[in-house]
Amino acid sequence: MAKKKSVDLFNESPTPKATAKKSAVKPQKTADKGYSAADIEVLEGLEPVRRRPGMYIGGTDSRAMHHLFAEVIDNSMDEAVAGHASFIEVEFMEGNRLSVRDNGRGIPVDQHPKYRDKSALEVIMTTLHAGGKFGGEAYDTSGGLHGVGVSVVNALASDLVVEVARNQELYQQEFSRGLAKGKLKKVGEAKNRRGTKVSFVPDEDIFGKIQFDPARLYSMAKAKAYLFGGVEIRWCCDPSLIKDKEKCPTEDTLKFPNGLQDYLEEQIGGRAVVTPQ
């Protein structure tokens, strides 16, 4: 039997002739600006975050600014979930200042083995990809951006203060726009206290005149409490900043022993359900 001749559709089809069109845009003569090693920038420290905040928090709008809160509270949540903290305090104050405090182990304040002129606290706050969540020894589970979160908050804050109660001593260090304003200093004793407090004001050079929304902050804190059942989050807000008291109380204790089950029960309310559980 004669073999069937295979048909190559590409060969059989005639090739359309390209019609030359004159470009509507006339090429412009540009001076040769050159491109040398001197044009290669190396951004150090937290400068990349300030130059391109969208790469780290998704933009410079209200949603992005509120994400700063998520990064700070995630560090405290990690301490609570790991069993080292029993509560987290969130306070929103005048001047667009937000603080998050926990009673966890406290950020280490001793000298860092690699950067001997800095404390571990300063390294964490001023260096990208510095933290205790990479090796898996300090934390079994963790949230946030793993070594990026709190340093990004520091980079995008016009004023940030960290207080650490550790080894019965109280330490404090101040920062502005990612840079330390001074060295870590001991400010007192903390015999019956431990943990970390981060207080910050978002930088208007980055976010403009955008203000934190108390109702949104409260909702975010409540969501964290639902997500990690049993963790206690204490909410406090300056009454003068609250526009809708139904959506945001001045004070509240958020603790849900059953976690997401409690959330579902709140959403369902009195409606009939298909199954009892």
Predicted segment positions?
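GHKL-type ATPase core
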Residues: A2-K3, V7-K17, K21-D39, N96-A120, ...
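Alpha-helix capping/hinge segments and adjacent helical runs
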Residues: G45-L46
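Conserved short strand/loop->alpha-helix "switch" segment adjacent to the catalytic nucleotide/phosphoryl-transfer site
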Residues: R51-F69
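Conserved ATP-binding N-box helix of the HATPase_c
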Residues: R63-F87, G149-L156
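Short beta-strand/loop element within the Bergerat-fold HATPase_c
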Residues: F87-E94
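Short, intrinsically disordered, charge-balanced linker/junction segments flanking boundaries
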Residues: A272-Q277
